[in-house]
Amino acid sequence: MKKVYYGWWVVGGAYLLLLCAAGTQFYAFPVFLDVMVREMEWARTQVALALTVGSFVMGAVGLLVGWLIHRVGLRPVMVCGAIIAGLGFFLLRTITEPWQFYLYYGLILSVGITGIGSVSTMTAVEMWFDRGRSTALGIATVGVGVGGVVMPLLAGWLISKYDWQTAYACMAGILILVGTPISAIIMRTPRERRVVPEQAQQKGLKAGDATIGQALRQKSFWLISVSAMLSYLAYSIGLTHQVAFAVDMGIDRLAAAGAVGLLCAFSIPGRLGFGRLGDIMDKRYVMMTAASLQAVAFVMLMKTTNLSMLYVYSALIGVGVGGLTPILPGLLADHFGGSHFGAIYGASGMVNTLGMMIGPVYGGWIFDTTKSYSLAFLSGIIITLLAIILIYLAPKPRSQ
């Protein structure tokens, strides 16, 4: 029986880590947002600000994580990340004031999630794959979609049956009990295994080795990163506020949380399908197609008046953002792959997570000011169209 290429074990580990990290910290947030607004009597802008603070921290720390991976290794960074993330969730059970929410969620939890999140996992997969890289990235990022299906429903069920404090404690347990052993045992580099990545060995390929300074001087880096930032900005407006938007229309809270799960479920074929397309055609056009689906989704959201329409929106934007997730690191790796990829991907993360900082607070501010989400959702369409234009202007990688 042929031995399984170890890179696929790394893909599996990345899948599980992203399931835990993205599902608990990001996709369960809209469920907690509604509860915090009701029980704490906080404004939606106040609660959404925690996600903005977290996005800023993740963007800033992402560059440091990429540098640390290059300096001290992948596994130490990821183990520390899992433990810190679990601590952040455990502390969230004790909050009584907004500043505590910002400290525990926005700072501590976000630092930990960055350690086991996309910078680390995408860097790990990139180390093992050259040919078929987008497919491998797509499979790994399916974990984000599955986590987005499971964790909001789990959080909603725990809150309904017990309370939000219990839900936060369970999130902490998941990150520590699952994230720590996977990070310590599975997430190894080719150097640690003393092997040459299979695809590079078979084809005699050698990825480029651009430094972060060289990458920052390239127009392609900024066009790709800013395009992703705009896409995530628009996406975060809808995702953060869609549960509250639905509840305002009279939709049951658990059913509204299910729409978040549906979004993530439809992101799975988006990740797999667009990931595969990224290996056989120009990734720029694949990324543009994914963003176009997001724009159409916002048109549907503006017309939504019932649960069925909300589900159609969730399906469309799920496929779109699912397609973006593996294509972004794949496109960056085509331009800047090599030993410094972690730092370069972290630097790109600093740019594109600006969108995740702005979107939640912008959506909350629009609602608190106008008592409607209409202008926020219209902005999502316009911003996504700008993202499509920028990626169209990005140059083609020299390797293609």
Question: For each predicted feature, which ranges?
Answer:
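Helix-to-loop junctions at the C-terminal end of transmembrane segments
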Residues: 61-73, 271-282
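Cytoplasmic helix-loop-helix junction between adjacent transmembrane helices
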Residues: 106-142, 337
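C-terminal ends and interior cores of transmembrane alpha-helices
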Residues: 83-96, 293-305
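Hydrophobic core of transmembrane alpha-helices in multi-pass small-molecule transporters
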Residues: 19, 100-115, 229, 309-322
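Extracytoplasmic
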Residues: 9-35, 40-44, 65, 238-243
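C-terminal transmembrane helical hairpin of 12-TM major facilitator-type secondary transporters
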Residues: 235, 255, 261-267, 273, ...
